[in-house]
Structures are given as structure tokens and as C-alpha cells.
Amino acid sequence: MHEQYTPRDVEAAAQNAWDEQQSFAVTEQPGKETYYCLSMFPYPSGKLHMGHVRNYTIGDVIARYQRMLGKNVLQPMGWDAFGMPAENAAMKNNVAPAKWTYENIDYMKTQLKSLGLAIDWSREVTTCKPDYYRWEQWLFTRLFEKGVIYRKNGTVNWDPADQTVLANEQVIDGRGWRSGALIEKREIPMYYFRITDYADELLESLDELPGWPEQVKTMQRNWIGKSRGMEVQFPYDQASIGHEGTLKVFTTRPDTLMGATYVAVAAEHPLATQAAQGNAALQAFIDECKSGSVAEADMATQEKKGMATSLFVEHPLTGEKLPVWVANYVLMHYGDGAVMAVPAHDERDFEFAHKYNLPVKAVVRTSAGDDVGSEWLAAYGEHGQLINSGEFDGLDFQGAFDAIEAALIRKDLGKSRTQFRLRDWGISRQRYWGCPIPIIHCPSCGDVPVPEDQLPVTLPENVVPDGAGSPLARMPEFYECTCPKCGTAAKRETDTMDTFVESSWYFARYASPNYDKGLVDPKAANHWLPVDQYIGGIEHAILHLLYARFFHKLMRDEGLVTSNEPFKNLLTQGMVVAETYYRVASNGGKDWFNPADVEIERDAKAKIIGARLKTDGLPVEIGGTEKMSKSKNNGVDPQSMIEQYGADTCRLFMMFASPPDMSLEWSDSGVEGASRFLRRVWRLAQAHVAQGLPGQLDIAALSDEQKVIRRAIHAAIKQASTDVGQFHKFNTAIAQVMTVMNVLEKAPQVTAQDRALLQEGLEAVTLLLAPITPHISHELWKQLGHEQAVIDATWPSVDESALVQDTVTLVVQVNGKLRGQVEMPAAASREEIEAAARNNENVLRFTDGLTIRKVIVVPGKLVNIVAN
């Protein structure tokens, strides 16, 4: 065994051994317990960042630990390879997105391998390859024929300069991010998944996921947004509107119906269109609303604006005339594009009514009383007894709901209804680098799905987009085709699918990545699925995780999988954060400096109190800790860390610095500490091995001192097993190993028993570290005399008899203050303990001249003598 620990050599040797033996390639083994551990696959952006390293290390520690428990562990990896960044990079560098993507995958794969991850690379999937997306197209055609996918007009952000559709996040202050042109709202035909058909099940089966963080389940519940309410119809005022009809609204607060003082409609509503005829000012306002953001989050924060129409509707119960307003806060796609406004009990209506001097009528007695003041109070939105509501006065929320519903049903002007916030999922993207939508538009037959024997519809890979619309729409060689039904000239769909589609089923494809008879091989899929442990960032809590759950149910209903949910347990890892440093630039902006280029000064408590740039020695401002990012220039390159310290040190630091679900603050001194610790383990093992391996430990002949050492070893095994196995608290498990190392380094090395005990301790340390620092553990295990590789060793078991203590040390307090210690046999009675405590030399000094009133004994811990 080399005297010096050289991570580069140790890690290369371990990785070569794993590659040669294909240590992580798994097959279905009926009868052996499976464990499917999956980290969210990366987008091949070019380089791994520390967030990736943390995510994949957490997954790897769990996978390796489960393997040590004797399970058949699947840990695959792939590439979420379609998407806009590739198009943007392609335009910037004048290179085809395919070339850019495949080069990035090659580089990032070598980076992942250098981390020593226990990945079955034979199952690698790349979503931009036809052998992957052909099955997505196959499922699309099946679902289209069943009506689960349909086509309708949808509102999009249209950039008139680039002639393209922009995502909400590409619209900055109403302008296109690339062209700077004012964005228009456009209606274009798009394809939609009927996810709303599954809304109830998606909501209810969250209760089948006890292994998910409550926070994520709450976010999904809110996103699905089930609300029970009432559909209320306000009859048209024929004098102003000119014809019969009713305005439908949905409300979750029908108890406040008697407080409605106006109604508001969306800019796209037919009543808005009618009112704008011959009213140029109203038409201009409607156009302004239509050009605003279509994102709900923006709507919530934007200024509430409205304009009166000359139209009125009638209150369904009183017949009173209520004015119709057009308002920018009403969404056409929620409810029916209209709301009844109750300013006294809804904050948004309250703001709007105050802005435009509309009446406010209180109809609920709240904790703030019967009246509503000029400033909004949260209490105004409470449920309470009805007032100013005629026959409904005195009723509570439920009583009013039922009575008002009955009154509306009698007049045929309302009924109770369940509503969801969730909308159907529009998947059409006017982009090039995505999965082609397998539809042919025929002038006679309409939309015809591409027949199975003509799949995949292959995306041409030698295209460099220019940002002006989709290049596919300008490629007759791509879109010109014949109708599969009637044989006439037809046109292929040039939109591609939302890239969330690829990541909604990849976890199932890993079970049979080379299967060529369907989306998945049902036998293999049901062998591995559902995923036992899924690991990824909280930012995917809603969209990705909801779409993946939806797709799993689609696959189940197609007979491909039998389970209801894709991921049994979910771990959302925290961010990696680091210090930021900047100087204010001449233009008022900030120039950010990488922490590696900054010299810092700390106070006695290690708090940073000053910072200077290394190049010029001048001060820089301290910006505080933030998530590692390019924009703040506070990232640390994982590759340089691996080259400097080795992968095991990086892995150890990341697992020790914080629990996996909390933010991890990068610290160079922490990395140094991890490196020092591994060198200590190596040194102790090297000195031990150099003397030749010892014989068997004779447990029956251990001295008291040796029993204490062995107790420390097995206490650490017990605690680490709980920390890793039950709670994923790798940081506290590592702390246990460090405690044992402190004991082993001080342990005497005189007798054969001493050396045999150290052997047991070093083996325990090696096994406990094996999932976290696999390379050094691989070498240590070999040097400690084992022929079988550490990856095939089992997790250490606790010898409970080693934890039994013959004697215990109790602290003795007098009136709550520590005054001494007594060592007692573990089986000593309460009376014996009390007598020993009273007669302790130091205790006698502090009780001299006092009367002992009471003695409290806490077995195994302390004795408190109360005296005065």
C-alpha cells in the first residue's frame, strides 16, 4: 500500500476495475429485491455545475447503500437533449444544434464518469435521437386517435420582427428578448393533452405518496386548484345589450352574491367585442389587454385596469341592473371569462372598485365587524353570518351556499359546479430543435396521424436556425408529403413538441432502452417501476413532476405499466450557494468577480469582513451568499476541484456540509477539511497494513479499554445505518465515522487483540464510507485483505452485545449545578446510585451544613441533589 494517498491513481484504478467488470450493468433477476434509484437527467448545456454534482452524488450514495443491502439496484443516466438553449447556441456560434448537443454530451459524460457514479451506462437514453422520440410520436398518434390529444386555437406571444412565437419568459417588458419588437397576442392552432380529464385522479393520488415532501404535494394541489363553487347566470339587460342571453360566471363565494355591484369580463369576451364596436377608446383598451402577458403570475402582480361599457346585466335574485366592465385581471380561460365583483369581500374587486368609484356593499359579518373601511383588511375576506342579504340574513357560509343555490335553481339561473385551475397542456412549439409532431394536414381528410410504419418523422439534423420562425416551415423537403389516407398532396405539421414531453416518460424507457416493439417492454417496465427514489430540484415540483405523473397514468391506461404513480419517494435537494463579490461599474451596473480571484479577510468568528481582488489588490464589495450562477460569477468548476482534490473529496464535502434537502454553502476550507480527513484514514490504514494483517478478534477476551473502543465502532454503525437508511442524513453519518476515527487513532497498538480490533474498526470505516467515497474505499478494502470488491460487500451489521455497558458514568448535580461524577455498575439500584452520589468527595463539600431535601435519579444519566 502506497504511503501517500494520491486520489488520481486511486480513482483511476477503481474506475478501471468497475468498467472492466461492468460492475453497474444490471439485468432483471426475478426473486431478487429491486431498487430503482433515479436522479433527474441533465440538459446537455456543455459543462456540469456543482448543482449537478450534488444531485448525482446524493443519488449515487443512496444507490450504493441499497446495493450493500443486497438489492438489485438500477441507476441509469441519459440526456434531456431537445430545447431552446441549443438553438440559441447554434445561432450564436453558427453551428447545427445537433452537433453542439452531441459534443456537449460527450464532454459531460466524461465528467460524470470522473465522479465515479455507479451508473448502468448500457441504458443511456438521448431524447433527441430518433430511436427515443419515435415512441413519443407513436404514443401521440394513439392518444390523438382516442381524443386524449386534440387541436384548437390557443393564444401565444407573437414576435412580428422574428416572425416567431415566444415563451412567456422570453417576453421582457412587453418586448421580444432578441428583436426588442413589441409583442402581439395571436391565436394559432395548437395541440393539447387533455390533462384536465385526469385532474381529479392527479389530485387524489397525491395521498398515495407518503414518501414525497409535503411542500411539493401542496404546490401540486394548488396548481391543480380544485374549487367547489357555483355557476351563476346574470340575465342580459335587453335594453342595453339588444338581445336575450345570460352572462355565466363561476364563483367559490356564492354566499356573497347579494353584495355583487358590477361584473367584469375578459378582453376576449363576446360582450367586450360588442361593446367596443363604435367605441375607439374601449377598442384601444381591449387591444392593450390582449398584448399583455398570458402568464397568470404576471396577471396577479400587474396593475388592475378596467373600462366601463355601456352594457348592463341583471342580478339573478334582485333584478337590479349591474354595469359590465372590461378588466385586465379577468382570464378568458378560467371559469367563463367573466367574474361577479363583490368589492366588500374580495381584495382584487375592492382595489378595482376604489380605483373606479364603484359601490361597495358589505353582506358578511366578519371579525372586523359589519362595515368595510377605505383600506382593505384580510378579515373582509372571511366567512361569516350574512347581513344586508334579505331572506338570507343570519345564515352561515354553508347555509347561505345551499339556500342561494336552491333559489338560483328555482329560477334556472345557477347550479353548483367543481372547477379546476389546471388547464389542458398545450404542447405545440414553433421551434426547430424538438420532436416533430406526427400529423399530416390533408385538404380533404383534415388532420391525419402518421401511420406507425412511417414513424419516426425524423428531424433533419444539419440545420442552423436563424431565429426567424421555424426553419422546418421553410423546408419543402421536410413538409411536402402525401396523405396516408387518400394519397393526395398534403403538408406535414412543422411544429415540434414541448420538451417537457420527453422528460415525462424517460424514467420508463430506462427499463428497456433498446426495446423496438413499443414505448416500453411492459415486462421490464413493471419489473423496475415505480422508481423507488427520485432526486431533483424543488424547481421541478409542479410542471415536470405533474406531467410525469400524468404520463404514467396515460401509459397505465395504454396497458404499458400497472402502477398508478411513477415515483414512490422524492428527495428535493437544496441549492449550492457561494459568496459573491462585485464592484459598481461606470454605467451603474455591477461587475461580478469569481471567489477564486478574491482575497478575503475574516474576523475571529470566521465572518468575512473584507475582500480584495487578487489582480489589483483593491477592495471589492461583498454581495453575500447566493445560488451559484453565471450571472453572479460565483460558480466553482467541478472539473478543477476533481483535478485538485479528487472526486472522493468533493463527494465527501458535499455530503458532509449540509443535509441533502438544505442549501449547501460552498467553502474552500470545507473541501480542504474533507481532503485532510481522507488522508488521515489512508495513513491509519497504511500504518496498520504495513505491520501485516492480524488474526481473528477474540470478543470474549476483550479488556475494559478494548470494550470501550469496540462500543464506539458499533455505536457508529448503528447510528450511521439509521441516518443513511431512514433519513438520508449523510452529514450526521459522516460525523459518526469521524468520531470513530478519533477513537481508532488513539487506540493502543500493542497486542494482537489491539490490532485485530483496529482491523474491525478500519473495516467498519471503509464500509460506512463506501457509498460516499467509493474509490478510496475500493482500495482500502483490498488492502485490508478482502478479495471481493467493496461494492459487493454488505453494509456492516451492529453487534448489539458490543453496545451493552458494564458500567455507566453519571453526573452529580447539587441544586442543578455540576459537582461531580460517579461510575456505577450498569445494573446498580436507585438506592446504590443515591448512596454513591451522596458520598462523592466533591458533593460532600457542597452539601456540608445543608439539609438534603430530595434526591432525583435519572437512570444512566444524572443525579440531582436538592439541599438547603
Curated annotation (Swiss-Prot):
It is found in: Cytoplasm. The keyword Transmembrane helix does not apply. It comes from the Bacteria. GO terms for cellular component: cytosol. SUPFAM superfamilies: Anticodon-binding domain of a subclass of class I aminoacyl-tRNA synthetases, Nucleotidylyl transferase, ValRS/IleRS/LeuRS editing domain. InterPro entries: aa-tRNA-synth_I_CS, aa-tRNA-synth_Ia, Leu-tRNA-ligase, Leu_tRNA-synth_edit, M/V/L/I-tRNA-synth_anticd-bd, Methionyl/Leucyl_tRNA_Synth, Rossmann-like_a/b/a_fold, tRNAsynth_Ia_anticodon-bd. Its EC number is 6.1.1.4. Keywords: Aminoacyl-tRNA synthetase, ATP-binding, Cytoplasm, Ligase, Nucleotide-binding, Protein biosynthesis. A motif ('KMSKS' region) lies at residues 627-631. Pfam families: Anticodon_1, tRNA-synt_1, tRNA-synt_1_2, tRNA-synt_1g. It catalyses: tRNA(Leu) + L-leucine + ATP = L-leucyl-tRNA(Leu) + AMP + diphosphate. ATP binds at K630. A motif ('HIGH' region) lies at residues 42-52. GO terms for biological process: leucyl-tRNA aminoacylation. Transmembrane segments: none annotated. It is an enzyme of class 6 (ligase). GO terms for molecular function: aminoacyl-tRNA deacylase activity; ATP binding; leucine-tRNA ligase activity. Belongs to the class-I aminoacyl-tRNA synthetase family. This is Leucine--tRNA ligase. It comes from Pseudomonas entomophila (strain L48). The lineage of its organism: Bacteria, Pseudomonadati, Pseudomonadota, Gammaproteobacteria, Pseudomonadales. The gene is leuS.
